[in-house]
A protein has these predicted regions:
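N-terminal catalytic cores of NTP/NDP-binding nucleotidyl/phosphoryl-transfer enzymes
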Residues: 21-78
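A glycine-rich helix N-cap at a beta->alpha junction
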Residues: 88-110
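Short glycine-enriched, charge-decorated loop/helix-capping segments at active-site entrances
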Residues: 81-87
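Short acidic, glycine/serine/threonine-rich loops at helix termini
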Residues: 76-80, 127-132
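Positively charged, low-complexity intrinsically disordered leader regions
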Residues: 1-30
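Conserved alpha/beta enzyme-core scaffolds, especially Rossmann-like or related mixed alpha/beta domains
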Residues: 105-126
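General structural feature for long, well-ordered alpha-helical segments within catalytic domains
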Residues: 3, 93-96, 128
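Conserved small/polar residues in nucleotide/adenosyl-binding loops
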Residues: 134-139
Length: 139
């Protein structure tokens, strides 16, 4: 069974955009990302499935990108809620992101040429996009 077939059989792949992705995954040539909003200072059991998938793909030679949502966490996400998520300060978000990184390093190899960790605050805050979204009315 190939890696892709295993992931599909376990229900970890719902769809793909191109069949070339199958070969990339099976041959350890895929670069992929999974996003994490840092609304708390600790990863949860819900994050564990994503980390397990990242680890499994990395062990097969693929390159994971852990995308920390430092910028998007500043906005909040009321999806499926009747109230807004508590707004966190930049300092709280930076602290949570640092905690996530320390915890993720137990599972994912962030060494040279391995996994990458990015924080979308690094580019979103420079665009002042966060300010626009923060001051825009909620639907």
């Amino acid at each position: 069974m190939t890696l892709y077939e295993e992931l599909k059989a376990r229900g970890l792949v719902a769809q793909i955009t191109d069949d070339e992705i199958i070969d990339l995954i099976n041959n350890g040539k895929a670069t992929f990302y999974i996003g994490f909003d840092c609304t708390a200072d600790s990863l949860t059991a819900g994050h564990f499935m994503a980390l397990t998938l990242m680890k499994r793909l990395q062990m097969a030679g693929n390159k994971p990108i852990a995308l920390i949502g430092g910028g998007t966490t500043m906005i909040g996400d009321p999806s499926g809620r009747t109230d807004m998520r508590k707004m966190l300060t930049k300092e709280d978000i930076d602290h949570n992101a640092a905690c996530f990184k320390r915890q993720m390093e137990r599972f994912i190899d962030f060494g040279e040429g391995k996994a990458i960790m990015l924080n979308n605050a690094d580019w979103l805050l420079k665009l002042n996009y966060v300010c626009l979204l923060y001051t825009s009315p909620s639907p």
